[in-house]
Amino acid sequence: MSLCIGNFDKSILPNSIVEAVTVPQKMYGVKFDGVNSAGVRTYDAARFVWEPSTATKAGKDSFLGIPMFTPRECITEYDTVEGKQKVVAYKGDNGYDTLKASKTGDVMMEFTRFYYYRPSETEWILSPEYIFGFKPAPAFYRDGKLLDKVYVGKYNLGIGYVSQSGVETLSNVDMNTIRTNLRSKGMYMWDLKWWETLKMLCLVKYANCDVQACNSAGYNSGDRTYPSGNADNVRGLDGSNTSIATNEACLTFGIENAYGNVWKFMDGVFCNDYYLYFKEVSEITNDPTSVADLSVYDKMANNIAVGGNNAELKTLTFNTDYDYITAPQTFGDGPYNDYYWGQSGLRECLVGGDAWLGGSGGLFVFAVHRAVGIADVNYGSGVMWY
């Protein structure tokens, strides 16, 4: 071993190594106190500002232009030769508006990989690059592979199993049927990996864990299956047509009605007696029909909140093996203003709430009280592919 004394000549190193050790790595964080809904942005996000947009005014958005915070709207179609979805056009391309208006393909939001570190229940730090101790955001690590992009439906899954503007939301269909129809076109239902990834982005950008109070109340009363496209005129990635408090369609990172409207089935996760069981969505063809079927699933070591049916959630799970999961840990008065439903037995997982939930919907509302195989007019799905 040789000893280097004095100034080190960096010219002998490859440019990639020099850049890695000399360019500060970006980190965008947020920290909450566990009592108040509003948090404090940290690191490179400390001086950032954000306000939701409306149909007449673009909001303030310091995050705009940073790839991980700026998903791209695009249209994708199923390639029958290669057996997978492909991007055919991005918003802004010539002919894009014509394709969208003619309901060609599916309208998706293209999200870019990032990494996260969650030091505690109430703190998140995100980075576009790998930093020691950080992990890939869960949506971007699947089947043992690191993904550059994930494509998420801009709209709730509509009748005809599409993500398109001006289509009635699909509901009253069970998970097996939805899963089968989406697989035939190279797509998946939303899963908890994606939902938790979206939460991370929202928490840092909004610096608030009550999205109905800071972004939009969304559809929180009335018809649960409004047609899609009612937020198409919002002049930004987040917000709603008129105001935060109005009962109307909303955008969250370009996704319409990510919460409210209809409950969203979560694939890849099931609950039994308050324990969560996980499996890659690519490996699931049918719902488990008995507890014995869960033997091939991974199990989170600690249980989520026991009981508490129709109760406000107070604290979130913080499990070192599944530190991206933010399921209810305890219930009572808390900063999230979201509700939790839980019952023992084999249950499906639903998130987001529906148009009947009022001010109790949002990113953290969580339900594991309905039996596997349920179909309900209040239940629908999101769509994604990778």
Task: State the predicted function of each range.
Residues M1-A20:
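Short, low-complexity N-terminal tether/leader segments at secretion or assembly junctions of large
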Residues I17-E110, Y116-R118, M187:
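GGW-centered surface loops in extracellular recognition modules
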Residues K26, V30-F32, E196, A217-R235, ...:
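C-terminal, surface-exposed recognition/capping segments
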Residues W50-A55, V107-G144, A301-I304, K314-E348:
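Carbohydrate-recognition beta-sandwich/jelly-roll modules
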Residues T98, S102-G105, I131-A258, V262:
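Short aromatic-cysteine micro-motif
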Residues F114-Y116, N156-G158, W194, V269-F270, ...:
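Acidic glycine-/aspartate-rich tracts in secreted/extracellular proteins
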Residues L157-N176, L276-M300:
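A solvent-exposed, charged loop/short amphipathic helix patch at secondary-structure junctions
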